[in-house]
A protein has these predicted regions:
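Residue-level detector of intrinsically disordered, flexible termini
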Residues: 80-84, 126-128, 167, 177
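Generic hydrophobic, helix-prone segments enriched in Leu/Val/Ile
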Residues: 1, 99-101, 133, 139, ...
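Terminal connector regions
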Residues: 28-30, 161-179
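Generic surface-pattern signal
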Residues: 113-116, 122-127, 176-177
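Short Pro-Gly-centered flexible turn/kink motifs
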Residues: 146-162
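Extracellular adhesion/glycan-binding regions together with long Ser/Thr-
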Residues: 2-4, 121-150
Length: 179
């Protein structure tokens, strides 16, 4: 499925395209996001936040969220808040969700309490966001694009994996090696 929208902020005109890819048997979705500058001047400081204000998965609304990266095909929690995290693991003992990007511009952030996405995720610096927390909360991913010249575009890919805890890490490794 492809969704395309056009927006104007101030004097900047841009087009956003989101492509969803999922097979009938997969337990993950691939999202491709693209921003195209359809205006006449450079698009600067373009940012995207993706995430949720409520981390409910399976039958639980209080989940453990950990920021990390994929190391040798497996999730590895980051050692400090200042370390870039491109993967979020959300688990409740039975179910697991992985939310991640392959983009070097992506940063997992948020991990706040349940509530307004703008205040709980968008206003949270990835460099100071908690690394590991258990709560009824929100989370997100932040990307700041390079400046985009008129007629040019920038894009990135992100993944949402949902499975049982027993099979989630193997699925993450398979998706990561295919990415």
């Amino acid at each position: 499925m492809i969704v395309i929208g056009r927006a104007t902020i101030g004097t900047k005109i841009f087009e956003v395209t989101r492509t969803y890819n999922q097979t009938s048997t997969s337990k993950y979705t691939i999202f491709n996001e693209s921003i195209k500058n359809v205006g006449t001047t450079s698009l600067t400081n373009a940012r995207v936040w993706i995430g949720t204000q409520d981390d409910w998965i399976g039958q639980n609304d209080s989940n453990t969220k950990k920021r990390g990266n994929i190391v040798n095909g497996a999730f590895s929690q980051i050692p400090s808040a200042a370390t870039q995290a491109k993967v979020l693991e959300v688990t409740n003992g039975t179910d697991t969700v992985y939310f991640y990007t392959t983009s070097n511009l992506g940063y997992i952030t948020g991990l706040q309490r349940y509530g307004d996405f703008r205040t709980q995720v968008m206003n949270q610096s990835p460099a100071t966001a908690q690394i590991n927390v258990t709560n009824d909360g929100s989370y997100g991913m932040y990307l700041r694009f390079q400046d985009i010249a008129p007629g040019a575009s920038e894009s990135f890919t992100w993944y949402y994996i949902a499975s049982t805890k027993a099979s989630a890490e193997a699925l993450l490794g398979n998706v990561a090696s295919a990415a």
